[in-house]
């Protein structure tokens, strides 16, 4: 896959002064998802970090980011919700990651939550059906586009004058869609394996 930083720089228009720095090695990411995610983060980090930075009377909008300082450390927070519930992705400085993770996990267990890996998160995300969000490397990758998804027209406004990738989508639609993405519900675990019918 093309690294995120390469994707960002590829969108730079001629003459624009844009720079990007990869700081991923300095951060640890924890997803806090579910109906009590807001309460948990509010108790650990305070309500202000969850506010809309452009309208502090409201909470963060879906797919927005905040930054905040805590004990001299710089954090990033994104409002997500891959499971069609309240959710955030918290980017914690490596220097305090172990300490913060222990606090978050302890608080989650106090609330009756669970500590799960990516498999558990993916199961909840897929169970959300059309409301579960796709992930890079799982449902989409450089070899698939939004056009391949059944609900493409409801998610992408092709009437919008410009967006990154529009030219490619217009071309794909004109040439005829060759692939479709679908969800298969199976019995048992079939991760990273094909789905067979009559041995094929």
Question: Over which residues does each language-model region extend?
Answer:
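Conserved, structured C-terminal
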Residues: 1-200
């Amino acid at each position: 896959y093309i690294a995120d930083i390469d994707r960002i720089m590829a969108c730079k228009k001629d003459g624009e002064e844009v720079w990007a720095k990869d700081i991923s090695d300095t951060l640890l990411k924890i997803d806090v998802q579910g109906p009590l995610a807001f309460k948990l983060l509010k108790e650990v980090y305070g309500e202000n970090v969850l506010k809309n930075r452009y309208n502090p009377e409201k909470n963060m909008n879906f797919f927005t980011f905040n930054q905040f300082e805590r004990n001299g450390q710089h954090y990033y927070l994104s409002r997500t919700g891959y499971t069609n519930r309240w959710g955030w992705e918290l980017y914690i400085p490596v220097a305090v990651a172990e300490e913060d993770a222990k606090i978050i996990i302890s608080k989650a267990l106090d609330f009756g939550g669970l500590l799960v890996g990516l498999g558990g998160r993916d199961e909840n995300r897929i169970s959300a059906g059309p409301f579960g969000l796709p992930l890079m490397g799982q449902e989409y990758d450089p070899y698939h586009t939004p056009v391949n998804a059944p609900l493409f027209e409801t998610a992408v406004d092709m009437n919008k004058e410009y967006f990154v990738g529009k030219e490619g989508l217009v071309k794909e639609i004109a040439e005829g869609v060759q692939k479709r993405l679908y969800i298969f519900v199976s019995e048992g675990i079939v991760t990273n394996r094909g789905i067979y019918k009559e041995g094929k």
